[in-house]
Amino acid sequence: MVPYQELTLQRSFSYNSRKINPVTSPARSSHVRSPSSSALIPSIPEHELFLVPCRRCSYVPLSSSSSASHNIGKFHLKFSLLLRSFINIINIPACKMLSLPSPPSSSSSVSNQLISLVTGGSSSLGRRVTGTLYGHKRGHVTFSVQYNQRSDPVLLLDLAMSTATLVKEMSSGLVRIALECEKRHRSGTKLFQEPKWTMYCNGRKCGYAVSRGGACTDTDWRVLNTVSRVTVGAGVIPTPKTIDDVSGVGSGTELGELLYMRGKFERVVGSRDSEAFYMMNPDKNGGPELSIFLLRI
């Protein structure tokens, strides 16, 4: 049996302390330039080696971009000013078919001016007017239009139906009165100045109505003064029993009671040849509805 022996191995450390010269190294010896070729290439100092500009990089000064944006801003400003002036030059027509002017103040002089204007044309009335239907029980109905409940009437229409017939029609809850007149060529007559109208009530021809403009009789003044404090309502006004009682003579034709109905009407202007008055129900409880149309055809 072989006896156990310890073996010791020693490592040897050796290094080469020779420095490698890149000029004399074998890898660079094959790439060393000849003196003739190196003489043709100028030498570049080390401090200027990284300061050579690239041909592909173009330097754009900041002043040129700011001047371009300034020019664009001036162009937008001039264009906006030109557009605004162009819009101001254009006159866009507005629809004045349904436009109603504001009513004037309720003084006596202005009220007289209102009467003269409305008898010549209905454009000075407001959108809300006061309408009164009145007449003797056995006589014809008169329709009065006022700016307010205390002003002078601007339109008086003697309708072609009796008061009793109107009361009977209104008991059905729906009354449509249409007044038509012929349009005359080259006529400057206003709608309220038309003297004669053909009257229709709920589609049935009733006869002819007469317009008196704003001319009031003594009976008209008495009725309107009596109901001047009434805004909405209906009733009976005490009157003489006969026509002759008014003049002082003892006998005559019996007129009957004078009935009236008063309320606010909404006035709608369709054109210079058409207007409408709609009776407004204040409590909206489905009461009698009345509409009066003025048409020039």
Curated annotation (Swiss-Prot):
GO terms for cellular component: cortical endoplasmic reticulum; cytoplasm; endoplasmic reticulum; endoplasmic reticulum membrane; membrane. InterPro entries: MIZ1-like_pln. Expressed in root meristematic region, cortical cells, lateral root cap cells, columella cells of the root cap, mature region of the roots and leaf hydathodes. Keywords: Endoplasmic reticulum, Membrane. GO terms for biological process: chloroplast organization; hydrotropism. Its main location: endoplasmic reticulum. Pfam families: DUF617. It is found in: Endoplasmic reticulum membrane. Disruption phenotype: No visible phenotype under normal growth conditions, but mutant plants are impaired in hydrotropic response. Induction: By light and abscisic acid (ABA) in roots. PANTHER family: PROTEIN MIZU-KUSSEI 1. The Japanese words 'mizu' and 'kussei' means water and tropism, respectively. Plants over-expressing MIZ1 in roots have a reduced number of lateral roots formed, however this defect is recovered with the application of auxin. Plays a role in lateral root development by maintaining auxin levels. This function requires GNOM (GN/MIZ2) activity. Negatively regulates cytokinin sensitivity on root development. Positively regulates hydrotropism in roots. This is Protein MIZU-KUSSEI 1. It comes from Arabidopsis thaliana. The lineage of its organism: Eukaryota, Viridiplantae, Streptophyta, Embryophyta, Tracheophyta. The gene is MIZ1.
